[in-house]
């Protein structure tokens, strides 16, 4: 379960990293976890991401306005992914495209969050 959440968080982080900087919004891991929970079934090999999952990914993408927010989301996703058993990396990486969110990064548990701006 934790891995799925990490993958979902990674997807959200990638989405946030691609967002243009705007007014600062202090994001935390609790918020990231909450937005990504609906994606857990999918990252554990279940059927395609739900509408609720995609809404969470879009919300995170829109809320991650600053580099700091995007890096926070990235680190939160990595932490969550470490705890998910039966994590399907392909499903996790496909979330942005399946949710119609353009992310120019590959979602992975070993992404270097410090390189996200």
Curated annotation (Swiss-Prot):
Keywords: Disulfide bond, Lipid-binding, Lipoprotein, Signal, Transport. Residues 1-26 form the signal peptide. A lipid is attached at residue 33 (Cis-14-hydroxy-10,13-dioxo-7-heptadecenoic acid aspartate ester). One of its GO terms (biological process) is lipid transport. Pfam families: Tryp_alpha_amyl (PF00234). It comes from the Eukaryota. During brewing process, structural and chemical modifications of the protein occur. Both unfolding of the structure and glycation should increased the amphiphilicity of the protein, leading to foam-promoting forms that concentrate in beer foams. Coiled coil: none annotated. Disulfide bonds join 29-76, 39-53, 54-99, 74-113. PROSITE patterns: PLANT_LTP. GO terms for molecular function: lipid binding. Transmembrane segments: none annotated. SUPFAM superfamilies: Bifunctional inhibitor/lipid-transfer protein/seed storage 2S albumin. CDD domains: nsLTP1. Aleurone layer of developing and germinating seeds. Plant non-specific lipid-transfer proteins transfer phospholipids as well as galactolipids across membranes. May play a role in wax or cutin deposition in the cell walls of expanding epidermal cells and certain secretory tissues. Belongs to the plant LTP family. This is Non-specific lipid-transfer protein 1. It comes from Hordeum vulgare (Barley). The lineage of its organism: Eukaryota, Viridiplantae, Streptophyta, Embryophyta, Tracheophyta. The gene is LTP1.
């Amino acid at each position: 379960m934790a891995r799925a959440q990490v993958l979902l968080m990674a997807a959200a982080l990638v989405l946030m990293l691609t967002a243009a900087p705007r007014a600062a919004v202090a994001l935390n891991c609790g918020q990231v976890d909450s937005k990504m929970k609906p994606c857990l079934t999918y990252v554990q090999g279940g059927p395609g991401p739900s509408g609720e999952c995609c809404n969470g990914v879009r919300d995170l993408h829109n809320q991650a306005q600053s580099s700091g927010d995007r890096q926070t989301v990235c680190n939160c996703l990595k932490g969550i992914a470490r705890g998910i058993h039966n994590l399907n990396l392909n499903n996790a990486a496909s979330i942005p495209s399946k949710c119609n969110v353009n992310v120019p990064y590959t979602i992975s548990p070993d992404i270097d969050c410090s390189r996200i701006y």
